[in-house]
């Protein structure tokens, strides 16, 4: 793939290139997650793609393969409280920063999905739709998505009345109906408009 070659490890052979992506900016509940991945060019992983187009079982299998074969990977998050105190964009960038800083080696370059980048101690380049173009970003999107989905399963066990296992925190009709019935739980983002509608401030 031309885009993968353009942004690949060959240009930075000493320390590698990290792909960075997030999961969970839009939902009404739960932390926002981010991951950073430095792939091993000697151990390519087939099937990497934007996590949103992969079925859950495929994502899980790829996540395990990424963890086993990548040169370095890290998953991080910013909590619901952090989202409410600093806003979702800043919290997302904080989670990305934590993910890159958690790698066991500092990359020469971080390729970040989207058009906003965190402050890092290495060179940074943003790439629109990078999760579909650059394998390292695809890998990061898969790790972030599977980690957040696991977190929402945990929240479902704590607060089964909301159906987090079904909508993953997004503002679906079911979720909004359960919010009207039960009100927000401690993991709902009080700075988000649908939660503010219940008269609970951040």
Curated annotation (Swiss-Prot):
Its EC number is 3.1.26.4. Disulfide bonds: none annotated. Signal peptide: none annotated. SUPFAM superfamilies: Ribonuclease H-like. Its cofactor is Mn(2+); Mg(2+). Its main location: cytoplasm. Keywords: Cytoplasm, Endonuclease, Hydrolase, Manganese, Metal-binding, Nuclease. PANTHER family: RIBONUCLEASE H2 SUBUNIT A, RIBONUCLEASE HII. Endonuclease that specifically degrades the RNA of RNA-DNA hybrids. This is Ribonuclease HII. The lineage of its organism: Bacteria, Pseudomonadati, Pseudomonadota, Betaproteobacteria, Burkholderiales. The gene is rnhB.
